[in-house]
Amino acid sequence: MMFKECEVLVVGAGPAGSAAATAAAEGGAETLLIDRKKEIGTPVQCGEVVGETLLKKLNLKLPPGAQAAKLDHTRFMLDRRVQLTSREPYWKAVTLERKIFDKAL
C-alpha cells in the first residue's frame, strides 16, 4: 500500500470532485484526487447536459470532442402530462461526452 501526505484529499474524480480538487490546488493546497475507478468518466452515470451559463461562470473551456450537441432550449418533464420548455438564453445548454469532459477536468 502506498502512502502520500497531502493537505486536501478529494475522494471521487467526477465533475464535482475534480472541480473541488482544482480549486484547492489553485488555492495553494497540496491536493490529492483519488477515485475507485481505473478510468475517469466511465461508466457515465448522468449529468451529460450542462448549461452554457454554468460553463461561463466556472470559466470552463470544453476540450476537443467533449461537446456532443448544442441545445437551444431546456425541457423539464414531471411526467408525460406536465412539460415546460424554455428557450430563454439562460437555459441554452450543451450535451457532453462525459468520458472526455471528466478526464479534462
Question: Each predicted region: which residue ranges?
Answer:
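N-terminal Rossmann-fold NAD(P) dinucleotide-binding loop
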Residues: G17-S18
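Short, P/G- and charge-enriched loop/turn segments at secondary-structure junctions
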Residues: L60-G65, Y90-W91
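Glycine-rich active-site loop/strand segments that organize a redox cofactor
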Residues: P64-T74, L78-R81
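Conserved N-terminal helical subregion
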Residues: F76-L105
